[in-house]
A protein has these predicted regions:
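Short, internal strand/loop/helix patches
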Residues: 84, 97-130
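Thiol-/selenol-based redox modules, centered on thioredoxin-like
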Residues: 127-159
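Short pre-active-site segment immediately N-terminal to redox-active cysteine/selenocysteine motifs
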Residues: 48-50, 54-58, 90, 121
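Conserved redox-active cysteine motifs that mediate thiol-disulfide chemistry
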Residues: 54-71
Length: 159
């Protein structure tokens, strides 16, 4: 019964996502770097569906969804789907967090405020189509392996 409720809840969240494609391109986000201080640009991923996961080490729902995010990533290796996990926390704190948990995702440091993404709660996941336009966003923790989410991403990947 709990599982059914959970699946219905997740489905309701995903169906309520904004699927309006008004070419909501995310403008240049200043000061994005990888954890080795190399400049990172979202534009480098055009031609791929990009899953941008905004998170923090102190955010329990953020941490909880990483396992399903990694499962999703591993299931679709070779597809035109990329994932980046962006946090604005201290780089050393992010590195220590990753080392303890051994996540294999691309972690990016935002040297600024998450409001650049118009994100005001965590976790927030923003899906960009192959042209870099925002397709939809989810402002809560989700199961990235749910059929509903996977189907939406695969439709974008085929376009």
């Amino acid at each position: 019964m709990n599982r059914l409720f959970y699946l219905l809840f997740i489905s309701a969240i995903l169906f309520s996502c904004d699927l309006n494609k008004d070419d909501k391109k995310i403008e240049f986000i200043p000061n994005l770097t990888d954890l080795n201080n190399n400049e990172f640009k979202l534009e480098n991923y055009e031609g791929n569906v990009l899953i941008v996961n905004l998170w923090a080490t102190w955010c329990k729902p953020c941490v909880a969804e990483f396992e399903s995010l990694e499962k999703f990533k591993n299931k679709f290796i070779g597809k035109k789907i990329k994932i980046v996990a962006i946090s604005n926390e201290n780089k050393d704190k992010i590195k220590a967090f990753i080392e303890k948990r051994d996540f294999d995702l691309e972690f990016i440091k935002l040297n600024g405020d998450l409001s650049y993404f118009n994100a005001y709660s965590l976790p927030t996941t923003i899906i960009l189509d192959k042209q870099g336009n925002e397709s939809f966003r989810i402002a809560s923790g989700i199961d990235f392996t749910s059929n509903n989410f996977v189907d939406k991403i695969l439709v974008l990947e085929e376009l």
